[in-house]
């Protein structure tokens, strides 16, 4: 992406917000203080009514749009969605991207130094949930004197975080856009997460999560976890279209080396991810996914759980997403309608599987553009 494009955010930089008030977590643990790394795009208007919070997915972070001056190839993960003239138009909205608590891109997490020990938190960093993140979003908004977000938007785990905030702080959210998400993980999804965790936990370099002091990193386990996850983010059709049974070298080698293009692709994705992500954070994020279940305290009644919500909702799903299928989005829509809340829903034709929410798609983007254009400030 050229930084000169008219619809580009251009050069951006990350900032850091510090919080000294102790944060009580759902696990019972307490963080005496913490920091959140964030980026903003656009300008906060005079009455602070145009703030939009972007919630990231498992492997995402605060770098949602734009590029860095010292690394112009590092484009924000939702750059096709956010910018001047884009579906989330920064000429109208003040957009905020936050690296969640427990992340590994600057916010307080397992790789951070524990002031009490002088060492990295590592495995001692407490598990965090979407409810804990919702608390941090509210505190962040308070620091900016933002009484209410014009919209909270997220895909996948980010969609769950958006729902959580709309439920836990209903007076702070006017609109919630939930994309490719679910109100709870299925048993199959929990199983996928556990297999990914086991790949990391059983890596000899994991050292019970204290690999920092051993000078190691469970790269093999993290690599396998990412490869498994990536398979679930794609669809059979997209894999067939992109790779089929194509061989790297044109003929069978009759050995156990990487032969098929799909194998090469997965190895590349795994290697790249293992170089950039922290294993303890990966474990933590998968547990946040597993634990998300707003109906749990309501005897499994999702409609009762959503009785707290006040926001208007846009819920989007993708036809080929088998990780978070359209049926799961329809469960959310039903719960919202049961509470007579305003909700719009669309099931978007796509062959790209769960990753569709990150893709450039005219129909998908037009739906979000139209919804955002109708938000009055």
From Swiss-Prot:
Disulfide bonds: none annotated. It catalyses: L-homoserine + succinyl-CoA = O-succinyl-L-homoserine + CoA. Pathway: Amino-acid biosynthesis; L-methionine biosynthesis via de novo pathway; O-succinyl-L-homoserine from L-homoserine: step 1/1. The active site is at residues 156, 321, 354. It is an enzyme of class 2 (transferase). It comes from the Bacteria. Its EC number is 2.3.1.46. Its main location: cytoplasm. Keywords: Acyltransferase, Amino-acid biosynthesis, Cytoplasm, Methionine biosynthesis, Transferase. Homodimer. This is Homoserine O-succinyltransferase.
């Amino acid at each position: 992406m050229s930084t000169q494009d008219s619809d580009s955010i251009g050069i951006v930089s990350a900032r850091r917000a510090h919080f000294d008030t102790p944060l009580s977590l759902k696990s019972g643990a307490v963080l005496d203080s913490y920091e959140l790394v964030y980026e903003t795009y656009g300008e906060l208007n005079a009455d602070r009514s145009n703030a939009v919070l972007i919630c990231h997915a498992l492997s995402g972070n605060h770098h949602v749009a734009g590029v860095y001056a010292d690394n112009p190839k590092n484009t924000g993960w939702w750059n096709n969605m956010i910018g001047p003239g884009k579906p989330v138009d920064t000429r109208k909205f003040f957009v905020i991207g936050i690296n969640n608590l427990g992340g590994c891109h600057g916010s307080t997490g397992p790789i951070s130094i524990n002031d009490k020990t002088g060492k990295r938190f590592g495995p001692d960093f407490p598990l965090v949930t979407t409810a804990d993140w919702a608390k941090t979003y509210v505190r962040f908004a308070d620091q900016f004197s933002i009484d209410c977000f014009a919209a909270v938007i997220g895909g996948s785990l980010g969609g769950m975080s958006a729902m959580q905030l709309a439920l836990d702080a209903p007076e702070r959210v006017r609109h919630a856009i939930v994309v490719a998400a679910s109100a709870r993980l299925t048993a199959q999804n929990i199983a996928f997460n556990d297999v990914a965790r086991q790949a990391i936990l059983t890596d000899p370099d994991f050292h019970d999560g204290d690999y920092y002091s051993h000078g190691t990193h469970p790269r093999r386990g993290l690599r396998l976890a990412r490869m498994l996850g990536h398979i679930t983010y794609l669809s059979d059709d997209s894999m067939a279209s992109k790779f089929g049974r194509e061989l790297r070298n044109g003929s069978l080698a009759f050995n156990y080396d990487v032969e098929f293009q799909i194998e090469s692709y997965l190895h590349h994705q795994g290697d790249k991810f293992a170089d950039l992500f922290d294993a303890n954070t990966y474990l933590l994020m998968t547990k946040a996914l597993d634990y998300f279940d707003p109906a749990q305290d309501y005897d499994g009644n999702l409609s009762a759980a959503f009785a707290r919500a006040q926001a208007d909702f846009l819920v989007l799903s993708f036809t080929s997403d088998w990780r978070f299928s359209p049926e799961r989005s329809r469960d959310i829509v039903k719960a919202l309608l049961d509470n007579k809340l305003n909700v719009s829903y669309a099931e978007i034709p796509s062959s790209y599987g769960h990753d569709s929410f990150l893709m450039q798609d005219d129909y998908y983007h037009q739906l979000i553009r139209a919804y955002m254009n109708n938000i009055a400030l």
